[in-house]
């Protein structure tokens, strides 16, 4: 089922800019979501990073609508007076009728204006509004589902606010209301039921039923067409939530999803084909290290190494300079996030490294928040021992240095037998004795509340990865979000990612996947799957993703065992790379950040808003989509500088020199010439394929007149890439060649 986008990103370096043709002077955008200034999940990141781009387009006519939370307002919002008379009258009217509505500025980049609705203060109207929802939409909400009840309150308050704003506006604006996820979907349904003159958009970032089915060990993607959705939702006691989500999808003027894979899922589960796919982006400037990300990687890796020294005290029998750091992070959904596949692949990798006598060691981190009651005592002790050893070494070093200085000052060579006295040797022996431990280093850094049934810990027991000296793969489960104030691993998430070598995200259900995207913009290679939105997006736009450090694991057309074997192959091949090859690969990975910038991906949202305006106000706006063939898009070519496969890339000399491994000097090519990052970056960017089609979406406004420009066709440089761009995978059901 091909699902072409109605707008292409045509402004990557070397391509023409796409100009906005709509007159938005008398248009207002309200973006409604439960995670406005309220961090719960990934939608918070979407709104936070997209705010600046949307604000640049809409200016002061852009508002975010979300729930009022005391914690969120205290730490993220500056309360202000309403900037316009119409908005002030709207807030005053609602507050005078028993609601509590707050207005302010979200303290993030772009500083968007926010309207916060106090859901708890309106609980007095819950039963009446639930009755109205039943009469209007035939959706009943049980009393015990607090989240669904909050969705009802939030939806009615949002509709009340939009209706009041339209009533209080002297010059009736063209209002666009963009609703994210089912928690905000009730408001969309009510806007259509009450016939408010509002252009509505509904974006689902993941379907409710899809997430529940995948978590239940169901062969989800092979049975999408066969599910009895009402029966499945009812058995999982989420039928009322499913009805809210499905109603919002059908009521919206424009329905969007975040990825091609989720679009197919939504068509079968929600019974509506999305109008457009709106991929998630990132604020790339935030992660830009100005060509210093290699140095930042080294600095962050040193912080991780300090933790490893303490965690493995007494068993630090591996070379930290030959140690790679892998990690998986995200919501603790054991099978959905692919932690089961990752653990199995680590066990197989451990076997391969041992039987092949590899000197490489892998430390795999699992950063997934779970229920804990405290830090593990052994883990805390390890960091304390490490700090004590450091203090002891510094004390001895100072005494040694002072005696050496005094000896040289009088013009004689020091007597090495007198440099350290008996007290110094006693101190060092005590330090060595403190590093002795009988048990293996702990697998988990915290005390788990359900240790016996925790899926990660039970799997580790089954595969036998206990951090023994014989293991080449070590496992560390950190069941808590990373923080720079932690007494164990005092780094924030961004710094931790920069210090690792590879992010592993073998997800079975991942509508988009921000974690591999964040790795990409920070120049860290990652493993994703062809069942994640990010993985499909990269396969579509990159001719050879693995050459750029984006490994795509096949979890669609392979069995679970075959997927584990493929992941093991990826991991083992990565371990075989030299430091030089990893540096080159990180340079290429960071170069892909342009693909994920909201500056370009935000245009999908722009297209969705234009489509909604043309459907809601056809007398004022027209939208003429010009669908292009999927194969006419652009693709990053395969890099021509160095073969991406470690097995095909050899050193120019039997042993690497220190100069060769220094990232500041740049790695050497096969012919001995220095690898130039800037030159390679320019070469790759020159060879981005230009689209050979007229602009896909042509929008006109009756108020501003019609103006249509076609994108000039650009020619790409001739590299050793295929003469014709490869077409992206159009459907999950199609076999790949």
UniProtKB/Swiss-Prot annotation:
Keywords: Allosteric enzyme, Diabetes mellitus, Disease variant, Glycogen biosynthesis, Glycosyltransferase, Phosphoprotein, Transferase. Residues 634-737 are annotated as: Disordered. Allosteric activation by glucose-6-phosphate. Phosphorylation reduces enzyme activity by constraining a tense conformation of the tetramer through inter-subunit interaction. Phosphorylation reduces the activity towards UDP-glucose. When in the non-phosphorylated state, glycogen synthase does not require glucose-6-phosphate as an allosteric activator; when phosphorylated it does. One of its GO terms (molecular function) is glycogen synthase activity, transferring glucose-1-phosphate. Pfam families: Glycogen_syn (PF05693). Residues 682-695 have a biased composition (Basic and acidic residues). PANTHER family: GLYCOGEN [STARCH] SYNTHASE, MUSCLE, GLYCOGEN SYNTHASE. Residues 658-681 have a biased composition (Acidic residues). InterPro entries: Glycogen_synth. Alpha-D-glucose 6-phosphate binds at residues 291-292, 294, 297, 301, 501, 582, 586. The keyword Phosphoprotein applies. Pathway: Glycan biosynthesis; glycogen biosynthesis. This is Glycogen [starch] synthase, muscle. It comes from Homo sapiens (Human). The keyword Phosphoprotein applies. Phosphorylation at Ser-8 by AMPK inactivates the enzyme activity. Primed phosphorylation at Ser-657 (site 5) by CSNK2A1 and CSNK2A2 is required for inhibitory phosphorylation at Ser-641 (site 3a), Ser-645 (site 3b), Ser-649 (site 3c) and Ser-653 (site 4) by GSK3A an GSK3B. Phosphorylated at Ser-641 by DYRK2, leading to inactivation. Phosphorylated at Ser-641 by PASK, leading to inactivation; phosphorylation by PASK is inhibited by glycogen. Dephosphorylation at Ser-641 and Ser-645 by PP1 activates the enzyme. The modification Phosphoserine is found at residues 8, 11, 412, 641, 645, 649, 652-653, 657, 698, 710, 727, 731. It catalyses: [(1->4)-alpha-D-glucosyl](n) + UDP-alpha-D-glucose = [(1->4)-alpha-D-glucosyl](n+1) + UDP + H(+). GO terms for biological process: glycogen biosynthetic process; heart development. UDP-alpha-D-glucose binds at residues 205, 211, 331, 510, 512-513. It is linked to Muscle glycogen storage disease 0: Metabolic disorder characterized by fasting hypoglycemia presenting in infancy or early childhood. The role of muscle glycogen is to provide critical energy during bursts of activity and sustained muscle work. UDP binds at residues 39, 331, 515.
